[in-house]
Design a protein with these regions (language model features):
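Alpha-helical transmembrane segments and membrane-interface helix-loop junctions
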Residues: 1-162
Length: 162
């Protein structure tokens, strides 16, 4: 499981980081075309918006993998280790179900609907950009399963004070 987590982390860091770098370059290009060349680039503005969504959702998957998602430590910090383990597994299950229903199922639905719609400046099917929703959902589910296995094996620190 640790190898899978490391591989996913590396891939997501490259994709999210690459999106950020490309967004920065394209935003600089927008400034140059708008203020220096006096001919604004519309396609780059649209692409930056889609890259931002990709970066945010892939970054959210990374956070899920690090168990950095929102929690309420007050509820578990005074519990016994066995109860803490149970609550952590429950939390991961809720996150996995949410990702499966909202991101995977809902993402597939919206992606298939958006395949017929084209972007205004790029001329690409909107579904191409929406595919990040089910992708992120699948990654979140995978990370949740890895987290549950590691919680049950005791390889994850359940100390909530960190």
């Amino acid at each position: 499981m640790s190898q899978l987590r490391k591989a996913l982390n590396m891939i997501l860091n490259v994709l999210a980081g690459g999106s950020f770098i490309l967004m920065t370059v394209l935003t600089c290009w927008q400034v140059i075309t708008r203020y220096i060349l006096q001919n604004p680039s519309s396609w780059s503005e649209e692409l930056v918006s889609y890259l931002f969504a990709w970066m945010a959702l892939l970054g959210a998957s990374l956070v899920c993998g690090e168990r950095g998602h929102m929690n309420i430590p007050l509820l578990v910090e005074k519990d016994s280790p066995s109860m803490r383990k149970l609550l952590c597994v429950f939390s991961e299950l809720v996150a996995a179900v949410f990702a499966a229903v909202i991101l995977v199922y809902g993402g597939i639905q919206i992606t298939s609907l958006a395949m017929a719609q084209m972007t205004s400046s790029l001329g690409v099917a909107m579904g191409v950009f929406y595919v990040v929703l089910p992708l992120s959902g699948v990654l979140n589910v995978i990370y949740s399963v890895i987290n549950i296995v590691e919680i049950m094996n005791g390889t994850i620190n359940l100390d909530v004070t960190e």
